[in-house]
From Swiss-Prot:
Belongs to the FlgI family. One of its GO terms (molecular function) is structural molecule activity. This is Flagellar P-ring protein 1. GO terms for biological process: bacterial-type flagellum-dependent cell motility. The lineage of its organism: Bacteria, Pseudomonadati, Pseudomonadota, Gammaproteobacteria, Vibrionales. The gene is flgI1. It is found in: Periplasm; Bacterial flagellum basal body. HAMAP family: FlgI. InterPro entries: Flag_FlgI (IPR001782).
Length: 373
């Protein structure tokens, strides 16, 4: 079996060496723009808080938990309120507070927080977020948030019920509104190897990354495990590991071929066609059949001296119109620009384009994946 394995390895090497060299026109992309490093990622925090100072735009009486939250907060400051008493506050809103913690952020760093209304408040504009603890998935408090809420939207309502609303007035941000109190632990420095997870899995990209790392740091430092993962041996010394990651940030490789894909957004009518989309030989004709049915009333008048009554009868008019459609023939291997020009020449709308591409896919003439979002 050993000679066979040796022959097979030599055969693969010969195939690799026989591939055409990378074109100078191909753009090299920084490795760190193609991968995520295991153990280095953002962490999400969430909390429940109160926004005050809303000038009558806060939660209404139907939102009971806002009143309960105010009562509990005032009790912490020594203000006693009877449980049966409803404060009926209009200047307060219950909100969710979220924040993203950058990888390896340390205590004392500030974070931007997003504040969103939970109840039926009309606007958070001009409000102030009171002291709010932010917790991680483990339930521990990692940051404290407080500050003035910046809202990009606005809302105005008249007594007659007319209303004008711009953007979303019930959500805003507090820039640098949270302070990180604890560091979120990571196992990055404890692992014997560094794992690079490709954002867009590709065997070619994984091979190019491993080869570039080995060319820089020496043979057998990195190995492509599969099309979505590359492992590289790393020094245990923290300083050397930082230097290694710094050098990795400066490396660039050529990305592998992207899959042929067409994306439809049926809600907005958006169609995005990838670069590598091609079609086989096909003839396309697209026309519109329009049927219009209209109802009208007509007076039925009998002849003079004849028995009969004057009545109003309904008359139905049906008009069928089929527009003349051109036929376009695509040769095998037709590329993106030819497809777009041909579809535009037919006068097709984005919705028509969806129908044409779906029909081509059913006919087996489209070598691309259709994705509907």
């Amino acid at each position: 079996m050993k000679p066979i394995n040796t022959f097979f390895s030599s055969f693969l090497l010969a195939l690799t060496l026989g591939l055409p060299a990378t074109s100078q026109a191909e753009v090299e992309i920084p490795i760190m723009d193609l991968v995520d490093v295991r153990g280095i990622r953002e962490n999400q925090l969430v909390g429940y808080g109160l926004v005050v100072g809303l000038a009558g735009q806060g939660d209404r009486n139907q939102v009971k938990f806002t009143s309960q939250s105010i009562t509990n907060m005032l009790r912490q400051f020594g203000v006693q309120i009877d449980d049966s008493m409803d404060p009926k506050l209009r200047n307060v809103a219950s909100v969710s507070v979220t924040a993203s913690v950058d990888p390896m952020a340390g205590p004392g760093q500030t974070l931007d927080v997003v504040v969103s209304s939970i109840g039926d408040a009309k606007s958070l504009r001009g409000g102030t977020l009171l002291l709010t603890p932010l917790r991680g998935i483990d339930g521990e408090v990692y940051a404290i948030a407080q500050g003035s809420v910046v809202v990009g939207g606005l809302s105005a309502e008249g007594k007659s019920g007319s209303k004008v609303e711009v953007n979303t007035p019930t959500a805003g941000r507090v820039p640098n509104g949270a302070t990180l109190e604890r560091e979120i632990k990571t196992d990055f420095n404890q692992r014997d190897e560094i794992t690079l997870n490709l954002r867009k899995p590709s065997f070619t990209t994984a091979k190019n990354i491993a080869r570039e790392i080995n060319n820089t740091f020496g043979p057998n430092v990195a190995v492509a495990i599969n099309k979505a993962r590359v492992d590289m041996r790393a020094p245990k010394d923290t300083q050397q590991r930082v230097i290694m990651m710094s050098m990795l940030e400066e490396m660039s490789v050529v990305e592998g071929r992207k899959p042929a894909r067409i994306v439809f957004n049926s809600r907005t009518g958006t169609v995005v066609i990838g670069k590598n989309v091609k079609v086989g030989e096909a003839a396309v004709s697209h026309g519109n059949l329009t049927v219009r049915i209209s109802e009208s009333e007509k007076v039925s008048q009998p002849n003079a001296f004849a028995d009969g009554e004057t009545k109003v009868v309904n008359q139905t008019d049906i008009d069928v119109n089929e527009e003349l459609a051109q036929m376009v023939i695509w040769p095998p291997g037709t590329e993106l620009n030819t497809i777009v020009d041909a579809v535009n020449s037919l006068g097709a709308t984005p919705t028509d384009l969806m129908s044409i591409l779906q029909a081509l896919n059913e006919a087996g003439a489209l070598n691309a994946e259709l994705v509907v979002i």
